[in-house]
Structure formats: structure tokens, C-alpha cells
Design a protein with these regions (language model features):
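Extreme N-terminal, non-catalytic leader segments
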Residues: 1-9
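ASCE RecA-like P-loop NTPase motor cores
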Residues: 8, 137-140
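Conserved P-loop
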Residues: 8-99
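Short, glycine/charged-enriched secondary-structure capping and boundary segments
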Residues: 25-26, 52-55, 80, 120-124, ...
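Hydrophobic/aromatic ligand-binding patch that stacks against planar heteroaromatic rings
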Residues: 29, 54, 128, 148-149
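Phosphate-binding/switch loop-helix module in NTP-utilizing enzymes
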Residues: 74-137
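Phosphate-binding/switch region of NTP-binding enzymes
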Residues: 143-178
């Protein structure tokens, strides 16, 4: 085994809880190692999440941007044009950030949802990832990761739910799930 060092493409997917949380843990570790991190949340809107306050403590070492409305209209034959526009804007910013080399780690939170809902082309994302600067790491999160995304990735983790408190009527807990 060689001692190869290069930026990784990491996918956190699957139906279980913890995809974004795992990405946040990796981001925190990266900041602790002196790296700069950008996290773009493709679908989350202006709702308040605890991690937003925590990230502010890192200044320009860890920047998080919410790029969506906070919800997506699903079930229609075609995605809502407003959702598509917001996803395209988020992707344009993400692609620019990745290619700039300004960030050591770029987290594309919930991008897999955007792709699976037909709001973004997986092939376009993969093509851009293939051109990224050598030492830039990218994490893509969300359920239903597209097969071409999985193929392009170096590491793929599938989260699966074994048991969840919600099934017993316990609502989401502040500081734990938001």
C-alpha cells in the first residue's frame, strides 16, 4: 500500500439518520487540522439549526450556507421550477468553490436528494468532481445517491436505521437533531 495523499470524494447516503452529522464531524476534524471548510446546504432554508451558531465560532475557517427554501415539493411529475433554480444556484456556488482550491473541504449537504428529485444532473456533478484540484476533499450527503456518484466516490457510507426514538413518539431533540 502506498502513502498516496489526495483529496477524497466521500458520499454519506442511505435511509438512516446521521449523514449530515457525519459530514459535520469530518468538517470539525478538518478545521482542527487547520483546513478551511465550506458547507453548502442544498435544501435547508432559513430555519435555525444549532450547528449554525457553532460554526460561527470558527470564523472564515468553517463557513456554512443554507441555499434552499427548507422544503421541496415532491410527488409532482416535474420538480418545482423555484426549487430547480435554487439547486442550480447552489451547485454553481459549490462547483466554483471546489474548483477554486480556496477550500480544503467542500460539503455538498443534501445534494443527493437534489439529484434524485431530478433537479440536478448527476453526470454534470461527476464531470466537475473529476476536474477538482488534487488536494480538495468533497463530501456529498443525502439519501438515494446516484450510481454515477457512488462510482466516482472514493468512500461511500450507507446509513441505515435500526431503531429511532420517533417511532416511540419522541420528537426531535434540540441540540441532538437540530
Amino acid at each position: 500500500m502506498s502513502d498516496v495523499r489526495r483529496g477524497l470524494i466521500i458520499v454519506n447516503t442511505g435511509p438512516g439518520k446521521g449523514k449530515t452529522t457525519a459530514a459535520m464531524g469530518t468538517a470539525l476534524r478538518a478545521v482542527g487540522q487547520g483546513m478551511r471548510v465550506l458547507m453548502l446546504q442544498f435544501l435547508k432554508g432559513s430555519w435555525h439549526y444549532g450547528e449554525l451558531d457553532a460554526v460561527q465560532a470558527f470564523g472564515d475557517k468553517f463557513v456554512m450556507k443554507q441555499m434552499g427554501r427548507g422544503f421541496v415539493k415532491v410527488g409532482a411529475e416535474k420538480p418545482d421550477p423555484e426549487d430547480v433554480k435554487m439547486v442550480e444556484e447552489a451547485w454553481a456556488e459549490g462547483e466554483k468553490a471546489i474548483q477554486s482550491g480556496e477550500w480544503d473541504l467542500v460539503v455538498l449537504d443534501e445534494i443527493n436528494y437534489a439529484i434524485s428529485y431530478g433537479m440536478l444532473d448527476a453526470a454534470k456533478v461527476v464531470e466537475s468532481l473529476k476536474k477538482k484540484p488534487e488536494m480538495v476533499h468533497v463530501i456529498l450527503t443525502g439519501r438515494n445517491a446516484h450510481p454515477t456518484i457512488i462510482e466516482a466516490a472514493d468512500t461511500v457510507t450507507e446509513m441505515r436505521q435500526v431503531k429511532h426514538a420517533y417511532e416511540k413518539g419522541v420528537m426531535a431533540q434540540r441540540g441532538i437533531e437540530y
